[in-house]
Curated annotation (Swiss-Prot):
Any GO MF annotation of the entry: structural constituent of ribosome
GO biological process: translation
Highest taxon of the lineage: Bacteria
Upper classification of the organism: Bacteria, Pseudomonadati, Pseudomonadota, Gammaproteobacteria, Alteromonadales
Family: Belongs to the bacterial ribosomal protein bL32 family.
Record's keyword terms, sorted: Ribonucleoprotein, Ribosomal protein
Annotated InterPro entries: Ribosomal_bL32 (IPR002677), Ribosomal_bL32_bact (IPR044957), Ribosomal_zn-bd (IPR011332)
Species annotation: Shewanella piezotolerans (strain WP3 / JCM 13877)
GO cellular component: large ribosomal subunit
Feature: compositional bias, Polar residues: 21-31
A Pfam family it matches: Ribosomal_L32p
Region called Disordered, residue ranges: 1-39
Protein name: Large ribosomal subunit protein bL32
Length: 56
């Protein structure tokens, strides 16, 4: 079983965790409808990069 040799300080723990935070999702405005959507994702009404890709 793995057991640590020496205790890691709060500072070292914090330094290790400094890159773990999540960033906010990148949003873009659709050229045809002006709707906000996530990057590289189809909008709610079925448009992707200005073209209709999903017919509902």
């Amino acid at each position: 079983m793995a057991v640590q040799q020496n205790k890691k300080s709060r500072s070292k723990r914090g330094m290790r965790r400094s890159h773990d935070s999540l960033s906010t999702a990148q949003l873009s405005v659709d050229a045809t409808s002006g709707e906000l959507h996530r990057r590289h994702n189809v909008t709610a009404d079925g448009f992707y990069r200005g073209q209709k890709v999903i017919n509902k």
